[in-house]
C-alpha cells in the first residue's frame, strides 16, 4: 500500500498545500488555532474519504443525497483508504446511552448473565431449578412413593376475573375438579368467580397413588399436567394443604415463583423484557419537590404560596383546598408556615377521605363526595400527558427532582433480571463498579464458576477483558458501565470511541483524531500515546490533530501548519520527524525545543481576607473536604481524571453561588457550610457545551454582534429606500431569507444508518438569503458575505464601526480570529464553543467582584494561544475578579496564584484534598500526581529565564 499524498489542497484557508503522510505512521498535525490543521485533516482528507465511500453506493441510493457529497477543493489525494473520524464532541444525549452500551461491553455482560448466570428466587432466596419430564418423574417416585397425591396444573396465578369461559373450556376437555384459592371445587356449568377479587386457579388432572406399578399412568398424567400448566405443575398430598412445584422452566420449588427463560434482552434496560417497570430502565424517577412547590412559607395559599397554583381564583382545586382548611379549622389566608403539617401533607399528597363541598358556586357538586389526589398527583399527571408542550413540561420540571428509583435502586432492571448472579454479583452491581475494580473482579472470576459455567463464559470473558483493557489504557478506569453518555466531557467521549475502535481490531484504516489528550492528566498521557501506537501497530495510519508536547515527541511524523492563523496561515511550515522538528525555526518548534516558553509570573498575587470557605463537600466521590478559595486571584483546580474536580467546582460551588445570586433552582451536591458569599456579586460559568444544536446558531448570533450588523444594514440608504426592517436581514424569519431552505443554507438529508448529511441549498447555494436581500451592500459586501468572513477579516472590515469592532476584537483576543462569523455551531469543537462563551462574557462589563469558572479553557489551543488567553484572564484578575480554572495544562498551572489538587486517584480512590497553595509549594508534595510534572515545567521555565537575561 502506498503512502498518503495530498496535492493542491485549497479548502478554507489552505494555500494550495501539498502534504505527505507515511502509511502505518502516527502523524501529528499541529500549529496555531486556525492555521489549517482541521481544514487539512477533517475538511480535506476525511471529507474526501467520506465522499468516496458515498460514491460506492448505487446511483439509486446516491439520488437521495442529491447526487452525493461535494468534492473538497483539492487537486489529488492518492493512497487514501477507509477513513474513520473520532472527534471531541459529547456523545449521545439520550439518558439510555451509557458507557457500557456505547462500548458494547454491557452487551457482552448481558450475554454472559443469560448463558451462565445462576438464578435466585427473590421471594425465598433459594436457587431456581428446572427439570426435565424424566427428572420430575424420578423425584415423584422418590418423594411420594406409596402416597396418594393430586396432580394440579396452574392456569391462573394471582389475577382478577370471573373466568367463566376458562371453566367452560376445562369442562369441555372433561376435567372435573379445580383448586380455587387453595380449595377444591367441582366444575359446574356456568361456574364463575368474583371478578373484582384476585384468584389462583389450578386444574386437577389426576388423583393417584404414586408407585412403580402406576409408572405409565403417572408419566401420561405428568405430561398432561405440564401441557395444561405451560410447563409448570403442582403436587398436593391428599388430605393436606402441602404443595410442591415442579417445572420445565426456572422455578422456586418452595413458592412456585417462575422466571422467564433467560435471554440477553432480559438483561437490557432498553427492553420492556428487562427494564424496571417503575423507572422504565432509567434508574431514576422524577418526584415532587415540596420546597419548589412552596418556596416561601411566609406566604399564604391565597397569596400564591403554592407556586404551581398561583394566586387564589374561583376554581375547583382552590375550593377543595378551602374545604380541607375548614376541616383543620385553618385559614387559606394564613401563612403556610402556620398551617398544621397534616393539612399541608393532605394538600400536596391528597386526602384519603372524599371531600364534600357546600359552596354555592359549585351547586351541581354540592353534597357530592369528591376525591382529592393532591397537588403532586395533579402535576405528575399533567407532566405525563402525551400532548404536553415542551414549554409546559419545562415549567413543570422545576417542581420535580430526580431520585434513585426506589424499586430497582438505580439498577435499571426488573427484580427478575437483578436476581441472576455470577461470582456473587448481579449485572446491576457489575455495571455500577468502577472499571478498574471491575477488571480486578474479573481476574479471579473463573475460579468461582462451575465447570459448565466456565466453558460457556470463557470466550465472552476474553472479549470483555480485551475491551476493558483498552478503556483502562486511555485513562478511563474511574468510569463505570452505567455512567450516562450525556454526562461525559468531550475528551472522555472521544477516548471511549478510541478504545472502542481499538477493540474492533480493524486494519488498513486511516484514523483521524481531534485532540484526544483533552481532559487527561499528564500522568495518563503515556497510556493514551501507547493506545494510539497500538492502533498504528495493528496496521493502520493514525493522524492526530494535537498540541500536546509529549504526543508530538512520540509521533513518527509531524506536520506543522502556519505561520499564523486564518488568512495568514494555511501553509505547511514544517514536515518531518520529531528530531528534525527540534532544529526547525517554527513557532511550534521553538516551544517544543524549549527556546520559547510561557513565562512564570515574577510574583504570585497575595492572598487577602476576601475568601470563599466551603466545608464538608461530599458529593459523588468527595470525602467531606474543606476548601478555601482566595478571591481576587487566579485559582487552578488540578487532579487526575475523575478525581472530583468538576464535582467540587461545577456541581457544588457553582450551584451554591447561582442559588445565592440568582435564586437558581439547581441544587448543589451535599456540603456543610459556605462563608464569604458577601464578597461575590456575579458568577459566570464557561463550559464546553455547544452554543447551539442546529446549523442556525453561530458565533455572530451567540455574541449578539449579528444584531448590530443587521442594524447597520437596515440604516443603509438602499434599505431605507426599500423600507427594510431588521427582520429582513435575519435568516430565522421569513421575508429576507431563502424560502427553499428556510434560511439554513443547507438541506438536511437523513441517512438512517449514517449520521445526517447537510448538503448546500440548490436555490441560494448556501448563502441563506434571497436575491433582493443580497442586493443591499455595505462597502461592497452583502449580509451573506459578512457572515462568510473570518473574525480576523471582519475586524479589518468593521474597523470604523466601534460597536461591532469591540465584540469582534474580544473573539480575536481569545484566539478565534480564524473562525467565520456565520460558522454553524454544529461544526465547532468543545474548546471553540467555550471560547465563544468566554468572549461573550468578556465583552460585558465586569463588576470587580465576579467569579469566572472555566472548565479546561486550553482545549484546542496552541502554546501561543494559551499565552494570549492567560493575558486576558490576568487582566480580569487585575480588576479584582476571581478566575477558577479546572485544568491539566502545565502552562496554566504554573501561571496560577493558587492551586487546589484533588486526588490521589479517580473515582472512589479520589475525592481527597491533596494540596492547596502556590505552584512552588505543590512541587514539594510527595503524594501529588501533578507535582513531578509541574516541578519539571518550572525548572525549564527558570532555565530559559536565566538564558534570556
How does the language model describe each region?
Residues 1-949:
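Conserved phosphate-binding elements of NTP-dependent enzyme cores
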Amino acid at each position: 500500500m502506498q503512502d498518503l499524498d495530498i496535492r493542491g489542497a485549497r479548502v478554507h484557508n489552505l494555500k494550495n498545500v501539498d502534504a505527505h503522510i507515511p502509511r502505518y505512521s502516527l502523524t501529528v498535525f499541529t500549529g496555531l488555532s486556525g492555521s489549517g490543521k482541521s481544514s487539512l485533516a477533517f475538511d480535506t482528507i476525511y471529507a474526501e474519504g467520506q465522499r468516496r465511500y458515498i460514491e460506492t453506493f448505487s446511483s439509486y441510493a446516491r439520488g437521495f443525497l442529491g447526487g452525493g457529497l461535494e468534492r473538497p477543493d483539492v487537486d489529488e489525494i492518492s493512497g487514501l483508504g477507509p477513513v474513520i473520524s473520532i472527534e471531541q464532541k459529547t456523545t449521545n444525549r439520550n439518558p439510555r446511552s451509557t458507557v457500557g452500551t456505547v462500548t458494547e461491553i454491557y452487551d457482552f455482560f448481558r450475554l454472559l448473565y443469560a448463558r451462565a448466570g445462576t438464578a435466585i428466587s427473590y421471594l425465598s432466596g433459594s436457587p431456581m431449578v428446572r427439570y426435565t419430564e424424566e427428572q420430575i418423574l424420578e423425584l415423584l417416585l422418590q418423594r411420594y412413593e406409596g402416597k396418594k397425591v393430586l396432580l394440579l396444573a396452574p392456569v391462573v396465578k394471582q389475577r382478577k376475573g370471573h373466568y367463566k369461559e376458562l371453566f367452560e373450556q376445562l369442562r369441555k376437555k372433561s376435567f372435573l375438579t379445580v383448586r380455587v384459592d387453595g380449595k377444591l371445587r367441582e366444575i359446574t356449568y356456568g361456574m364463575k368467580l368474583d371478578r373484582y377479587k384476585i384468584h389462583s386457579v389450578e386444574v386437577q388432572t389426576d388423583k393417584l397413588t404414586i408407585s412403580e406399578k402406576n409408572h405409565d399412568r403417572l408419566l401420561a398424567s405428568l405430561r398432561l399436567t405440564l401441557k395444561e400448566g405451560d410447563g409448570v405443575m403442582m403436587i398436593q398430598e391428599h388430605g393436606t394443604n402441602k404443595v410442591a412445584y415442579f417445572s420445565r422452566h426456572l422455578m422456586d420449588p418452595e413458592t412456585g415463583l417462575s422466571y422467564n427463560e433467560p435471554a440477553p434482552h432480559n438483561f437490557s434496560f432498553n427492553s420492556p423484557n428487562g427494564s424496571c417497570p417503575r423507572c422504565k430502565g432509567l434508574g431514576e424517577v422524577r418526584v415532587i419537590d415540596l420546597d419548589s412547590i412552596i418556596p416561601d412559607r411566609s406566604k399564604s395559599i391565597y397569596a400564591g404560596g403554592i407556586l404551581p397554583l398561583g394566586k387564589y381564583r374561583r376554581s375547583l382545586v382552590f375550593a377543595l383546598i378551602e374545604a380541607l382548611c375548614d376541616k383543620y379549622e385553618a385559614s387559606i389566608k394564613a401563612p403556610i408556615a402556620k398551617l398544621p403539617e397534616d393539612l399541608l401533607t393532605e394538600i400536596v399528597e391528597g386526602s384519603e377521605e372524599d371531600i364534600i363541598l357546600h359552596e354555592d358556586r359549585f351547586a351541581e357538586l354540592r353534597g357530592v363526595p369528591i376525591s382529592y389526589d393532591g397537588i403532586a398527583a395533579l402535576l405528575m399527571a399533567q407532566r405525563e400527558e402525551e400532548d404536553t408542550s415542551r414549554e409546559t413540561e419545562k415549567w413543570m420540571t422545576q417542581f420535580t427532582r430526580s431520585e434513585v428509583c426506589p424499586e430497582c435502586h438505580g439498577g435499571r432492571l426488573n427484580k427478575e433480571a437483578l436476581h441472576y448472579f455470577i461470582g456473587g454479583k448481579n449485572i446491576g452491581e457489575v455495571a455500577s463498579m468502577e472499571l478498574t475494580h471491575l477488571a480486578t473482579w474479573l481476574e479471579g472470576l473463573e475460579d468461582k464458576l462451575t465447570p459448565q459455567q466456565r466453558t460457556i463464559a470463557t470466550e465472552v470473558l476474553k472479549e470483555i477483558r480485551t475491551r476493558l483493557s483498552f478503556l483502562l489504557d486511555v485513562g478511563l478506569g474511574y468510569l463505570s458501565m452505567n455512567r450516562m453518555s450525556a454526562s461525559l466531557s468531550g475528551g472522555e467521549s472521544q477516548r471511549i470511541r478510541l478504545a472502542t475502535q481499538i477493540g474492533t481490531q480493524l486494519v488498513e484504516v486511516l484514523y483521524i483524531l481531534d485532540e484526544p489528550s483533552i481532559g487527561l492528566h499528564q500522568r495518563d498521557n503515556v497510556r493514551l500515546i501507547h493506545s494510539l501506537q497500538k492502533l498504528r501497530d495493528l496496521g493502520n495510519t493514525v493522524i492526530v490533530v494535537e498540541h500536546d508536547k509529549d504526543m508530538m515527541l512520540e509521533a513518527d511524523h509531524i506536520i506543522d501548519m502556519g505561520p499564523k492563523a486564518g488568512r495568514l496561515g494555511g501553509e505547511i511550515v514544517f514536515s518531518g520527524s520529531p528530531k528534525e522538528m527540534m532544529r526547525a525555526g517554527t513557532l511550534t518548534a521553538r516551544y517544543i525545543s524549549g527556546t520559547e516558553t510561557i513565562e512564570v509570573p515574577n510574583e504570585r498575587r497575595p492572598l487577602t481576607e476576601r475568601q470563599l470557605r466551603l466545608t464538608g463537600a461530599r458529593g459523588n466521590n468527595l470525602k467531606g473536604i474543606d476548601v478555601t478559595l482566595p478571591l481576587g486571584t487566579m485559582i487552578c483546580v488540578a487532579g487526575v481524571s475523575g478525581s472530583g474536580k468538576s464535582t467540587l467546582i461545577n456541581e457544588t460551588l457553582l450551584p451554591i453561588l447561582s442559588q445565592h445570586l440568582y435564586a437558581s433552582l439547581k441544587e448543589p451536591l451535599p456540603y456543610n457550610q459556605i462563608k464569604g458569599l458577601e464578597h461575590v456579586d456575579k458568577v459566570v460559568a464557561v463550559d464546553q457545551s455547544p452554543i447551539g444544536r442546529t446549523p442556525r446558531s453561530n458565533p455572530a448570533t451567540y455574541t449578539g454582534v449579528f444584531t448590530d450588523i443587521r442594524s447597520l444594514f437596515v440604516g443603509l440608504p438602499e434599505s431605507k429606500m426599500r423600507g427594510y426592517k431588521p427582520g429582513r436581514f435575519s435568516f430565522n424569519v421569513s421575508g429576507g431569507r431563502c424560502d427553499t431552505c428556510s434560511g439554513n443554507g443547507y438541506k438536511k438529508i437523513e441517512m438512517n444508518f449514517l449520521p445526517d448529511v447537510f448538503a448546500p441549498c440548490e436555490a441560494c447555494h448556501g448563502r441563506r438569503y434571497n436575491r433582493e436581500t443580497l442586493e443591499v451592500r455595505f462597502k461592497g459586501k452583502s449580509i451573506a458575505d459578512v457572515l462568510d468572513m473570518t473574525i480576523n477579516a471582519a475586524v479589518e472590515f468593521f474597523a470604523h464601526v466601534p460597536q461591532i469592532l469591540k465584540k469582534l476584537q474580544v473573539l480575536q483576543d481569545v484566539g478565534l480570529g480564524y473562525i467565520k462569523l456565520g460558522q454553524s455551531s454544529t461544526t465547532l469543537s468543545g474548546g471553540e464553543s467555550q471560547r465563544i462563551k468566554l468572549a461573550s462574557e468578556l465583552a460585558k462589563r465586569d463588576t470587580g467582584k465576579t467569579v469566572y469558572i472555566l472548565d479546561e479553557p486550553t482545549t484546542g489551543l496552541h502554546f501561543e494561544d494559551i499565552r494570549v488567553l492567560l493575558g486576558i484572564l490576568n487582566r480580569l484578575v487585575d480588576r479584582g475578579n476571581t478566575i477558577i480554572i479546572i485544568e491539566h495544562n502545565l502552562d496554566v498551572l504554573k501561571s496560577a496564584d493558587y492551586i487546589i489538587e484533588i486526588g490521589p486517584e479517580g473515582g472512589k480512590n479520589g475525592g481527597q484534598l491533596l494540596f492547596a497553595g502556590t505552584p512552588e509549594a505543590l512541587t514539594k508534595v510527595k503524594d501529588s500526581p501533578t507535582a513531578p510534572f509541574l516541578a519539571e515545567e518550572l525548572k525549564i521555565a527558570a532555565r530559559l529565564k536565566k538564558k534570556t537575561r
